[in-house]
Regions:
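Catalytic helix-loop patch of NAD(P)-dependent Rossmann-fold dehydrogenases
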Residues: 1-37
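Conserved SDR Rossmann-fold cofactor-binding beta-strand/turn motif
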Residues: 37-44
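Residue-level signal for the nucleotide or nucleotide-sugar donor/cofactor binding architecture
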Residues: 11, 15, 89-95, 123, ...
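Catalytic loop of short-chain dehydrogenase/reductase
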Residues: 1-14, 44-56, 66-69, 78, ...
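Glycine/proline-rich active-site loop of Rossmann-fold NAD(P)-dependent oxidoreductases
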Residues: 18, 30-33, 45-66, 103-115, ...
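Mid/C-terminal beta-alpha module of Rossmann-like enzyme folds, strongest
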Residues: 88, 98-147, 156, 189
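Amphipathic terminal alpha-helices
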Residues: 171-193
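Alpha-helical substrate-binding/gating segment
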Residues: 58-114
Length: 193
């Protein structure tokens, strides 16, 4: 997914974001106001990735395939599509988003442009689930739940090139930092609640 990918919002939240972009672009044209549009991946902070519902069987029981697997004990879900590919998602740590916003501030070459901001790379479920299992001591359940798989990445090449955007927080770093934050350790993590 890059800046030229057609915007096709599904749901009210996505529609509100698309409409806001259009309003900003219109205002920029009519009033000459310099505007830069930053499109964020799903933003997580303060260890929110640790509680991500799609990682836990107990939180995904609304899916009939997964509900049948519930035996009363938590399991981490290593979800894959019908071809056996682990799900893939591209998220962003709030620290990288703050960095991206800072990179865009005052950069004339960014005026009138749209940029994707996300973490350094997308993650696959196996990357996240194996690390979570090791750290939380929760067993893994490998499942192909059917339906539309989660499998996408954002292209952040333009933001890297034009803005100097250099995200640092991959999924493993987000998990490790989130757990350290929960233990009360001194981290640079940003609370989001």
């Amino acid at each position: 997914i890059d800046e030229a990918t057609p915007v096709r919002p599904s749901g009210w939240y996505a529609l509100s974001k698309a409409m806001t972009e259009q309003m900003c672009q219109s205002y920029a044209r009519s009033e000459g106001l310099p505007v830069t549009i930053l499109r964020f991946a799903m933003v997580m902070g303060a260890g929110e990735v640790i509680d991500f519902p799609q990682f836990y069987l107990s939180k995904m029981r609304s899916n009939p395939v997964l509900d049948e697997l519930w035996e009363g004990q938590e399991r981490l879900l290593l979800l894959s599509d019908d071809e056996g590919r682990p799900f893939m998602k591209h998220v962003a740590d709030v620290r990288d988003i703050v960095h991206g916003c800072h990179c865009a501030l005052g950069k004339q070459r960014s005026f009138g442009q749209i940029y994707q901001l996300a973490g350094p790379e997308p993650f696959t479920w196996d990357q996240a689930i194996y690390r979570l299992s090791e750290l939380l001591q929760i067993p893994i359940l490998e499942v192909q739940p059917g339906g539309a798989p989660t499998h996408y990445r954002f292209d952040i090449t333009r933001a890297r090139h034009d803005l100097g955007f250099a995200p640092q927080y991959d999924i493993v770093r987000m998990i490790v930092d989130g757990l350290a934050f929960r233990r009360g350790e001194n981290t640079d993590i940003l609370p989001t609640n």
